[in-house]
Amino acid sequence: MHNQAPIQRRKSTRIYVGNVPIGDGAPITVQSMTNTRTTDVEATVNQIKALERVGADIVRVSVPTMDAAEAFKLIKQQVSVPLVADIHFDYRIALKVAEYGVDCLRINPGNIGNEERIRMVVDCARDKNIPIRIGVNAGSLEKDLQEKYGEPTPQALLESAMRHVDHLDRLNFEQFKVSVKASDVFLAVESYRLLAKQIDQPLHLGITEAGGARSGAVKSAIGLGLLLSEGIGDTLRVSLAADPVEEIKVGFDILKSLRIRARGINFIACPTCSRQEFDVIGTVNALEQRLEDIITPMDVSIIGCVVNGPGEALVSTLGVTGGNKKSGLYEDGVRKDRLDNDDMIAQLESRIRAKASQLDEARRIDVLQVEK
């Protein structure tokens, strides 16, 4: 609907996490991490399936002990989304989850033991075609780097990352991605900018420990939005002290806002004033909840009066412009009907679902024609 030039993405190599491609122009993936006890298999499986339902491409699971590794085996058997095992310090856990079919190992080669143990894990990953994520965090920098720089700096995070990269380079292992996360937006952004100039591997974006649902979403939107708008980033996680499902929703909202990747409805709604002719806020809140199952990309504008309503409707898939007792409904920029203000939510839900079905069918026909 809008004619801005697409963002030019940084060129990177491609890896696969399970069957999900990352890097080299592949769609930017959205992931989250479980916050259950991994040894509670039922709770962890239920949370992973909830994340799948809202669109998670990849899910990370912490595996801190061998008991958790045994639980991971059972979890992996019950879910279809690719799983990343988050492992620190004990190389044996990495070898065990590799045996159980893990799709990616999140490790820092430098903290799982001596050179021989690193080699064992990397050789196992190579043999089983399992990629590795190097995850550098400002809160856990190596002691010598803390002493050298005095505090976490972009240069310190970069140096830490390159140490781990060098471990893999020495072992001729190229199937990896890297993250350099910090809770400070500017520190994280500059660290990623430096790293993007140093390596060709895919970058996993995140503002770590960003905060609660509201403040964390704001920090993540600013930090990830800056990087993504510069073409940096191949996969992302929004880290929130909240239900992990919210991380996926915010992640997709960031991508939708930048018109990088669309999933579901992009609601455009006015903040309301005394000119509104129907309850805009109540309508939007209700529709966001009722239509969470819609994954068809579409823009829906809900504007309470005729000041900005018609203009927004012209560039929306569906648009409502508030009017006296009845409001105008636009479809693909053309006024089609009038909706009763007293029954706005039900009428709009019905129209949106019908439009989503129409768009899905049109795409299905297009795919069939291409396949012919």
From Swiss-Prot:
Cross-referenced SUPFAM superfamilies: Dihydropteroate synthetase-like, Nitrite and sulphite reductase 4Fe-4S domain-like
EC primary class: oxidoreductase
GO terms (BP aspect): isopentenyl diphosphate biosynthetic process, methylerythritol 4-phosphate pathway; terpenoid biosynthetic process
Pathway annotation: Isoprenoid biosynthesis; isopentenyl diphosphate biosynthesis via DXP pathway; isopentenyl diphosphate from 1-deoxy-D-xylulose 5-phosphate: step 5/6
Cofactor requirement: [4Fe-4S] cluster
Top-level taxon of the source organism: Bacteria
Amino-acid positions noted as binding [4Fe-4S] cluster in the UniProt annotation, renumbered to this chain: 270, 273, 305, 312
Keywords associated with the record: 4Fe-4S, Iron, Iron-sulfur, Isoprene biosynthesis, Metal-binding, Oxidoreductase
NCBIfam families (UniProt xref): ispG_gcpE, PRK00366.1
Protein family (similarity comment): Belongs to the IspG family.
Protein name, as recorded: 4-hydroxy-3-methylbut-2-en-1-yl diphosphate synthase (flavodoxin)
Organism per entry: Salmonella arizonae (strain ATCC BAA-731 / CDC346-86 / RSK2980)
